[in-house]
Amino acid sequence: MKLFLDTADTELIEKHFQTDLIDGITTNPTLIMKSGRDPEEVYQQLIDMGIDDISMEVVGDFDAMYMEGLRLSRKFGKNATIKVPCTPDGLRVCKKLSRDLVNVNVTLIFSAAQAILAAKAGAKYVSPFVGRVDDNSFVGIELIDQISDIY
């Protein structure tokens, strides 16, 4: 299992990466916009900090997500993992990007069944929403156990 820090706060990232316990960063356009910075500037700063695996979320319909994912993958190379939502379009994008040898992280995972669909679509990673699972009276850590058995 790998642990990813979900933030766009580069000071926080730098602090936690010094522990050698964090394997990568996930972020999304909303987090980056809240920081008032350009997403690609943030991605480049993270790469310059030595972070090897950055999940870069794409949004929109199938075509928009696929084209943006391909563009980011080409621009940032091995450091880029494209993050897509676990929606019908997101899973289709995952499958197509995976066929293009692009690493994909499927987010908005609330069940083991969704993790199976993401794996079938070629996802390298899945991002379960443990906090929201716990908020809905389920046990989030059980979801992690189920997903780790699958992967």
Feature locations, PLM:
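Active-site beta->alpha loop and helix N-cap motifs at the rims of alpha/beta catalytic domains
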Residues: L3-L5, D9-E14, T19-L21, T27-K96, ...
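Catalytic alpha/beta core domains of metabolic enzymes, predominantly
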Residues: P88-C94, N105, F110-Y151
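Conserved dinucleotide-binding and phosphotransfer motif residues
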Residues: D100
